[in-house]
Amino acid sequence: MTTCDEQAAQSVIEYLAKKGHTSIGVVGGNLTETEISFRRFTGAKWGFKNSKLSFNQRLQYEPCRFSMEEGYQAAMRLLNRNTAITAIFAMSDLIALGTMRAIYDMGKRVPEDISIVGYDGIALSRYCVPRLTTVQQDTTQLAKKGVDLMLQRINYPYHATHKTTPFHLIEGESVIELNGDK
């Protein structure tokens, strides 16, 4: 039982593109170690393609573990390598919070200089300044359906199923609409 990570990540990139961002970075995950990272990265690539935006993995992607410190370090590397980035999709809210701090420490502002979208909808995202725009997963439904699937698996061990639960893009204050000035 999961959120459809590909679809959610795709919607983030398309959302940023509709806001006028054409140089979007992606921070987080390790594509060879976690399935979640791979699915979110795949969805982000779909978003670039659907929005007719170019994506150069070497210039626009920086892997990291799912923590604030790793997000901070990855964002510093990415933004030092590619100064044209106007928005970042962080593969988790913790990565996004570290990224926000890196942006601030580089003398830039969120969202005025660089917009950011996280993923998970953790409570802290509502209390940081600015409030984080994030993909919110229905954790209550994920837990309930996960238990149901586990019990089903115990009773019917050869009947594998995979289900997804809806996601919502929660608009905070961390994304700005570009008007052509950047």
Q: Which stretches of residues belong to each language-model region?
A:
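Bacterial carbohydrate/catabolite-sensing allosteric modules
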Residues: 1-182
